[in-house]
């Protein structure tokens, strides 16, 4: 899938979508083929840093106490303290809600054993296990990187869709972001993009435009 075909699909996705009174996101949808996804090694569970950013702020939760929790609060991030974490371990419905509402999790390293017991069963299958950091960490560099990161997680289904930007970004920026996802798929499998059956891109409220191979 070369840049020209990706650009063509991005332009088509724009033209197919009606204008809305909000900024629409652009998604990439990829259908895979000839992969046994009952085998965990064939599943895609990757974080990809998009060269031109997500075009949409991710929701980040920080599991911490003391100074690290205070730093996260100052940054406007969701903070989950130890007592709340223990409560989430008893309330699976609330744990799932937290997991679904947040894109990424960061955890104070010495709290990871408790995270594993309480939120692990919910975050693990979603590919959202927290990134551990020391209690004295500066969260800014990590948060800035996560603001440009998307998560691919096929689980056992031969398709995934992932955010690659928004309609305010240029066609070139969106195409570069799509290439970053395709390169990740290519590196994962020995036969590379052969395993991509089809790929589409679409704006939030628009129909999909196929990326020709």
Swiss-Prot record:
The keyword Ribonucleoprotein applies. Part of the 50S ribosomal subunit. The lineage of its organism: Archaea, Methanobacteriati, Methanobacteriota, Methanomada group, Methanococci. GO terms for biological process: regulation of translation; translation. GO terms for molecular function: rRNA binding; structural constituent of ribosome; tRNA binding. This is Large ribosomal subunit protein uL1. Belongs to the universal ribosomal protein uL1 family. Probably involved in E site tRNA release. Binds directly to 23S rRNA. It comes from the Archaea. CDD domains: Ribosomal_L1. It comes from Methanothermococcus thermolithotrophicus. Keywords: Repressor, Ribonucleoprotein, Ribosomal protein, RNA-binding, rRNA-binding, Translation regulation, tRNA-binding. GO terms for cellular component: large ribosomal subunit.
């Amino acid at each position: 899938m070369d840049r020209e075909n990706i650009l063509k699909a991005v332009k088509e996705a724009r033209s197919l979508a009606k204008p809305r009174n909000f900024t629409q996101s652009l998604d990439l949808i990829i259908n895979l083929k000839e992969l046994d996804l009952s085998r965990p090694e064939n599943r895609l569970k990757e974080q990809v840093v998009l060269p031109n950013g997500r075009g949409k702020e991710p929701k980040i939760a920080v599991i911490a106490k003391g100074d690290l929790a205070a730093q996260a609060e100052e940054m406007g991030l969701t903070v989950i303290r130890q007592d709340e974490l223990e409560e989430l371990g008893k309330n699976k419905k609330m744990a799932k809600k937290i997991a679904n509402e947040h894109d990424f999790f960061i955890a104070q390293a010495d709290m990871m054993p408790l995270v594993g017991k309480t939120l692990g069963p919910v975050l693990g299958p979603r590919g959202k296990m927290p990134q551990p950091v020391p209690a004295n960490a500066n969260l800014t560099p990590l948060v800035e990187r996560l603001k440009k990161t998307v998560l691919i997680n096929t689980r056992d289904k031969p398709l995934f869709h992932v955010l690659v930007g928004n309609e305010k970004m240029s066609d070139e920026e969106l195409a570069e972001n799509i290439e970053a996802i395709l390169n990740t798929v290519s590196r994962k499998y020995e036969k590379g993009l052969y395993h991509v059956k089809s790929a589409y891109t679409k704006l939030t409220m628009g129909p999909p435009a196929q990326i020709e191979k």
